[in-house]
Regions:
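Conserved hydrophobic positions within beta-strands
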Residues: 74-76
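Short nucleic-acid-contacting surface segments enriched for D/E, G, S/T with interspersed K/R
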Residues: 117-126
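Short, conserved beta-turn/loop elements at beta-strand boundaries and strand-helix junctions
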Residues: 80-85
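Short aromatic-glycine-enriched beta-strand elements
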Residues: 86-88, 92-99
Length: 136
C-alpha cells in the first residue's frame, strides 16, 4: 500500500470491552437484602434449612425457593482466633472466624466475631450474632 493510500484510510477509535456488573441472583440477593434489614433468611427444603440461603439443596439437588426467617442466635461449632490481623483482613484488631449453626438451620455460616477475647469463645457455645450494616 502506498503512503498516499495509507493516509486515505478511514479510521475510528475502537475499544473492546464488556461492561458487566455482578448480579447476586434471586436467592443470594434476597439473603443479602435480608441482612441489610437485620434479618437472617435461609432456604428450606423439607426439614432442612440452609444458611446462607442456597439455590439448590446439596442433598437432593432440588431448586430451593422457600425462604424462612431465623433468629440471630446460634451455636459456635468451631472457631479460629486471629490475634494479629494482617493487612488483608477486614478488621484491624483481634477477632475470631467462627462457624456458627444458626438456631433452626441445618447448615452453618462463617461469621467474624469482634469485641471479645479468645477466652470468651468456646466451641459448642451459644452466641448472639451482631448483623453487619449492609447497603445494597
Amino acid at each position: 500500500m502506498s503512503e498516499k493510500n495509507k493516509s486515505d484510510m478511514l479510521r475510528a477509535p475502537f475499544k473492546l470491552e464488556y461492561d458487566y456488573e455482578r448480579s447476586t441472583g434471586p436467592i443470594i440477593g434476597k439473603f443479602f437484602e435480608g441482612l441489610s434489614n437485620q434479618q437472617i433468611l435461609g432456604t428450606k427444603n423439607g426439614d432442612n434449612v440452609y444458611v446462607p440461603a442456597a439455590e439448590f439443596d446439596p442433598i437432593t439437588y432440588e431448586h430451593l425457593s422457600e425462604f424462612v426467617e431465623l433468629p440471630e442466635t446460634g451455636t459456635v461449632k468451631s472457631f479460629t482466633w486471629i490475634d494479629q490481623p494482617r493487612k488483608h483482613h477486614l478488621i484491624n484488631k483481634p477477632f475470631a472466624f467462627a462457624l456458627i449453626q444458626i438456631d433452626g438451620a441445618t447448615s452453618s455460616i462463617l461469621h467474624m466475631i469482634t469485641n471479645c477475647n479468645e477466652s470468651d469463645i468456646e466451641a459448642v457455645s451459644y452466641t448472639h450474632l451482631t448483623l453487619p450494616t449492609i447497603r445494597l
